[in-house]
Regions:
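N-terminal auxiliary segments of SAM/dcSAM-dependent transferases
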Residues: 1-45
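Glycine-rich helix-loop-beta junction characteristic of Rossmann-like nucleotide cofactor-binding loops
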Residues: 72-79, 132-133
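Short loop/turn motifs at secondary-structure junctions
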Residues: 79-82, 138
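A short acidic, Gly/Pro-enriched loop at the edge of an enzyme's catalytic core
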Residues: 130-141
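A short glycine-rich, Lys/Arg-flanked "PGG" loop and its adjoining helix->strand segment in the class I
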Residues: 151-156
């Protein structure tokens, strides 16, 4: 599945450590492996490092393991090849989903640094869940855990 340029909507093609569209809009992959497709750059998008560390510690305490396991069971009940986790944070849920192609989207670079470093089985992208860089009808399943519900994007 090809991501779409957040500026013009054309498909992005990976060329070494960048993704480029036919209109020559270019986006670099971070050394951790995620790509930033958020158009408006700001230092305070999403969670900061301390918030990510606190949530990661809490999630790894096992408090929400039952929820993660339940979601995985539901996903396994239907054939599913592609999944988008909207507001994926540090990838706690994304990394465990039993799907071949997994995509995590979040506005927090700090969260995605952690996610991409610890989960090489998923593709992580800094992007707004209300303006996803995905082609129409490209995902079998969309999951949102403790993030705003982007109904229009999920339906698309």
């Amino acid at each position: 599945m090809q991501l779409r340029c957040p500026i013009c909507g054309k498909p992005l093609v990976r060329i070494e450590r960048s993704a480029v569209c036919e209109n020559r809009h270019s986006f670099d992959y971070a050394k951790q492996g995620y790509i930033n497709l958020l158009i408006r750059q700001s230092v305070d998008h999403g969670d900061n490092k301390a918030m990510v560390q606190a949530r990661t510690a809490f999630l790894h305490s096992g408090s929400y393991e039952f929820l993660r396991n339940t979601i995985c069971q539901i996903i396994q009940e239907e054939p599913c090849n592609t999944l988008a986790d909207l507001g994926c944070g540090e990838g706690y849920y994304t990394s465990s989903f039993p799907v071949q192609e997994k995509y995590g989207f979040d506005m927090s670079k700090e969260a995605l640094k952690y996610a991409a470093r610890t989960d090489r089985s998923s593709q992580y992208t800094v992007a707004s869940i209300f303006h996803l860089p995905l082609p129409d009808d490209s995902m079998d399943v969309c999951v949102t855990c403790f993030a705003p519900f982007a109904d229009a994007e999920i339906q698309r």
